[in-house]
């Protein structure tokens, strides 16, 4: 289904693929990709070098990120939004926990849209990325979003997901600085068989690329004869999931299908044809034969942990036993897992089916699911099913077409445009429950279970079609390719009347006299200190998992209700992975604050004595070690919570994503790495002393000798901090992005 070609290729006239071409060098021909055409047009330097400084055309945020972004920008000198900035309310939109705090955030958002000239999308009107697809994208444009699934390449608009700090830079008319990326040709051939949906293709792509990191920080450019065989919703469903490959962004060729999207959304002027130049070079290629694609299931605890549904059916006990063993390794005695119990008479029984969000809740997905369930029902046993249309226009369309009625008649509960099932704030399964979902992720506990309280539920990702086939079979996991159905629903008809009624669009019409409306949970950022000459950090968490997700660094779900309150939110940092982290970090921070007052603790004094350093010019902070941290969400809180608790550094072998590393930098956390052949067999309580770190960072150095202080003595360690821009170095020296702007008035 998916073939990786790990060498460069030339694409001639958009049709012919060659390994070699004599008329143009790779660097010259790479400029002819769609990717470079868009990136270069957004580079404020206008050059063709290896560095790019990008200004975006528009931005997107949702209600668990925009408050922090605006608070940071305010503290850094914000006066007016200089570009269209849409704020959707699709995460804490149920306002089900924390009393008034969620709606307080929404009220703050509307007041900010009025004051600074923003776009405000009220609760449950649309999930963030569907609103962007409907109202914000333009061919050849770039959108920056404070959500990792900011991907609109299938509509000719490059999307990038980053932490809030990068959006703050754009609000202050600064740039997104990157090295010129490599570009990967994703060549689509054939057409998918009946019953195969976008999630099947996307899961296969993630399976083929994630573990090796082969497309990490590269741009995926989709082309080939198979593109024309995919409707827009199908393309969008693949595109949104490219985030899970750890690629930087994505872009597709555009055609009549894309033109039709802009036409029905009453924006024909925003369409233009995008295609590679006559000779374009790609650094590698992925070939996908759509005709051989099977129905897939991504098992816990990652979208890449995938098999075909037929493979699961052939060996259910063996495959689920391996998942159980993985769960026991991750959670130890905290939870009691019985996944193999889901095998009944040789078949796997799910407890819940969900179709939701930016990937699942499309018109086409819901229409085809309804066709599969037509005349059937989900039964009255333990299996339940819910569907969430991804916007009010989609909800209106499925209602008018009778799709809603068909789903409700089959026993599916219809719910509003809401991202809850994707981040643990809605439809949390029962303990030991197995939920099959057409959503973006199935990370540990992302569905809302709390292992610290003995809870664990499990999520497997499947396409909406196979979820519907499973629902029609009473929850027995079933491939949609194995059922007979006819999809007779009419094409999607878009109606934006509800947006015209409800969405506030104040871009270009800022009202600076407007007072921001604060609830009691909305707090300013605490004071953060500049970097001192030397750095002493104590390990507060040491994680040897292959990958550490941002969901583990700071949980989502109901915890996200506190994202407007930095101190309160930080109490949940690593709570589901390293429960003792917060207490250790607070004690370290307490000792550093005492040191700044001239009261050096015995703990700090002994460590400094061991390395011959003094307390006056040596900061003391906490540090997290993880093998590969930062996979998943763009949430800046994965880093800011560490900083609020006194975190000064991360140490790892590599960062899972650029966006997490950028979050660390913007919050003044030095992103150290160590060589892959170096063992890190230290434990919480051990310390790392980095002499002369401030001077080294400001001088442009990329590595430094440090010392690890353990009970057994002092050991050397060599740390790297590579590929930092001049601005990033100054941000680290100043202590965080806010300090950087405050000190320089940039």
Task: Indicate residue ranges for each PLM-predicted region.
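Fe-S-dependent hydro-lyases/dehydratases of central metabolism
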Residues: 1-746
